[in-house]
Amino acid sequence: MKIITCYKCVPDEQDIAINNADGTLDFSKADSKISQYDLNAIEAACQLKQQLGDAQVVAMSVGGKALTNAKGRKDVLSRGPDELIVVIDDQFEQALPQQTASALAAAAQKSGFDLLICGDGSSDLYAQQVGLLVGEALNIPAINGVSKILSLTDSTLTVERELEDEVETLSIPLPAVIAVSTDINTPQIPSMKAILGAAKKPVQVWSPADIGLNSVPAYSAQQVAAPKQRERQRVVIEGDGEEQIAAFVENLRKII
């Protein structure tokens, strides 16, 4: 059984600044980290490995120069995966879901797999699209919002998905893609032994050409900017008479 767990390197949100001149986001001083939601995907894959005994877990990511960071690679591998595959190219800097999914699908197809696990979304965009788009690209079953993995055999996966007023139990044939919610587990903190052992695990670095990806995206992000701040009018209405109430209602109408 070969399980691929996908993750994304995202900027640490506490280090992102806003350029006052044009409202664009400045990532120059922001360190990269594993997207918080993808930690659940990594943990889910490694728990399955422990249950099955003979499974192999491969961590996989698509991105830009952040994936060249040795510390980041060690962080991923210290959490349990046996191997790491990264697809690196400038075109994947701040890639949109369709671009990321196309590259992940091509890389997963080259690597081979039985089950591919994603987080429900990424910490930066949280579009919640990549897992389903990967399934579509590979023409295999895909389920998002998975809150529990009930069973996994050589041919079938059974999971639970919590909806607003019910819990679904779903079974799908392998190979398949699932996107797990944060309810599925609590990611473990790597031990010192695991951190030291991570440096010995294999890492494969691929380019778009290595996975046969030459397509030009149909759309691209032109700019990412913070919304313009509007000054408050600071309208103060004193009193509780009919005129004051009418003025209050009129001001409410203007903003609704």
Swiss-Prot record:
GO terms for molecular function: electron transfer activity. Pathway: Amine and polyamine metabolism; carnitine metabolism. GO terms for biological process: carnitine metabolic process. Transmembrane segments: none annotated. It comes from the Bacteria. PROSITE patterns: ETF_BETA. Keywords: Electron transport, Transport. Belongs to the ETF beta-subunit/FixA family. PANTHER family: ELECTRON TRANSFER FLAVOPROTEIN BETA-SUBUNIT (PTHR21294), PROTEIN FIXA (PTHR21294:SF17). Required for anaerobic carnitine reduction. May bring reductant to CaiA. Heterodimer of FixA and FixB. This is Protein FixA. It comes from Salmonella newport (strain SL254).
